[in-house]
Amino acid sequence: SMKKILALVLALAMMAVLACSAIAEQHTYHFEIVSKGFQSTYWQAVLKGTEARTKEINDEAGYEKITFQFVGPDAESNVAQQVSQFESAVNANPAAIGFAAVDQEAFVDLIAQAQSKNIPIIGFDSGVPGAPEGAVYANASTDNYAAGGVAAEGMWAKIKDRIAAAEGQVRIGEVNQEATGESVTNRGKGFIDKIIELAAAEGWGCAVIGNEYYVNGTTGAVVPEADAKIIIEVRVPSATYVDLCATEASVILNEEDTIAIFGSNQVAAEGVLVANESLYVCGSGDDEIIAVGFDSGSTIKAAVSDGTMYGAVTQAPVGIGRVLVDLLLASAEGQEVKDTDTGCAFYT
């Protein structure tokens, strides 16, 4: 009968509507992730975290809900290469962009472009300092200033008595691969300020010498070099390579009064180790230079376990990658997101 046919047509129409809405609910999101590098085990670990979290989300959804592309420059000093990678990311019109900028100035125009397209940007690791207001929705990163302080405290526990026993001045070196990226600069400043604070508690004055950016960037109270119990010498290479960091570290390791040295990221810490290969001055003994590093690549881990390097601060790069994916997805779905500290710890 006509009624039955009509009922059937309506039922079929209803099914079609339901089917369409089921398909419509299968939202897919593509993310572009522009990292600060690709070369170190650190960035590979961030990538592992993004892959693992993406797989979990897709498995849970029962379809490929998220896809991403992860790129980074050959070296962290290669600003031009990262600019073109970020430009490609913006042009791809993704649901959101993950970004760790190698430079604080170079991306202002491109970020404004992403903003005008309403593409959320999530900072990770060093994030995107100096970005226009509202462009970066949230960051997945270690609190780098605090992490520099963690490195200083770890070192201080080992050298405090030696400083007290020293007749004259002592020198603590710091090698930073650059003076532009947020993570390294904040880490470097966090270390210096914490050493100044710990020294002041013992009644010792510190002088900060070397690279101008860090000399001017300290917030702690410093004294003239001649009056200082502790000289903090900061050196920065011309580009972000291990061998160039090694050259800077050698200068510090060759100073008579050096008792400790800090390499503020994987590249700088490996530079300290390379410098030591021809000098044999670092170790864990009271007559040796106490080296402290950052990150937990295999070279640094091996040096810590054999005692060449006293200790290092480890971040959670896999955790950064995982949190990054969560923040990218939430921002793409229009949820409110906030900065997430991914933590760090000192290990010996």
Where are these regions (language model features)?
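Sec-dependent N-terminal signal peptides of Gram-positive bacterial secreted proteins and lipoproteins
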Residues: I5-I23
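Short, Lys/Arg-enriched N-terminal segments with co-localized hydrophobic residues
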Residues: S1-M2
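A residue-level marker of the well-folded mature domains of exported/periplasmic proteins
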Residues: I23-T348
